[in-house]
Design a protein with these regions (language model features):
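Nucleic-acid endonuclease domains
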Residues: 1-44, 51, 56-217
Length: 217
């Protein structure tokens, strides 16, 4: 209360939100200090007014929905390696070089453009298996379709939404609280699904994405 109208409160909040101390990261410390309704959980982030809240604070790049509990299935690296071997001829035909980090969505779209008709259905199935290994709780069909159709921006957004919804479906959390330290003043958003976020006129940041790779990081 008073953050937007009281310069002193805004300065105090901005200073506290940068502190990581006592086993709490940036944002967690500030919330714990400023509200009695915020408690640190034994495992996970915070309990706010009785709700389990996952806190994501971004002070450089965008927050990632990946941790020790939420990661691709163990068969994902093998599926990725098989894809690179199976479609080596088509990948080479695009003239693109696959870096050590893996294949980006726009590269997948380029490969789809040169895919022989007799391989189209199998290619789609293989991509679906790879995406499903990354997001085991989600229906990945629309993201795969967008990538195959060359709609790279749409595919990235769908991938980002899958990342959030997969994360929330696995974690024991009621919502995610995002704190963006890159804006002045800082901005906050709380949501329980990607639909909530988009419904509020916000969107997920979808930067460089490597669906076909061997390292989840």
């Amino acid at each position: 209360i008073g953050y937007d109208s009281n310069p002193a409160i805004q300065q105090l909040t901005d200073d506290l939100v940068e502190i990581a101390a006592l086993g709490q990261g940036k944002g967690e410390f500030m919330l714990s200090v400023m509200s009695k309704k915020v408690m640190k959980k034994q495992k996970g982030d915070l309990v706010i007014d009785g709700k389990n809240i996952e806190l994501k604070t971004s002070d450089g790049g965008a927050g990632r929905f990946y941790d020790q509990e939420v990661r691709p299935n163990t068969n994902w690296p093998t599926l990725s390696e098989n894809y690179l071997n199976t479609y080596k001829e088509e990948i080479d035909a695009t003239g693109l070089k696959v870096p050590g980090t893996g294949m980006k969505i726009d590269m997948i779209s380029k490969v789809a453009e040169v895919m022989p008709s007799e391989k189209v259905e199998q290619h789609k199935k293989d991509l679906n298996d790879i995406f499903k290994a990354i997001f085991p709780t989600q229906d990945v069909g629309s993201a795969v379709e967008a990538a195959l159709a060359g709609n790279v921006g749409e595919a990235k957004q769908r991938f980002a939404r899958l990342s959030l919804d997969n994360y929330l479906s696995i974690k024991d959390d009621d919502a995610v609280l995002m704190i963006d330290l890159n804006t002045k003043p800082i901005s906050l958003a709380i949501f329980a699904s990607a639909a909530d976020l988009y419904g509020a006129g916000l969107r997920l940041h979808a930067g460089t994405i490597y669906p076909i790779a061997t390292d989840a990081r």
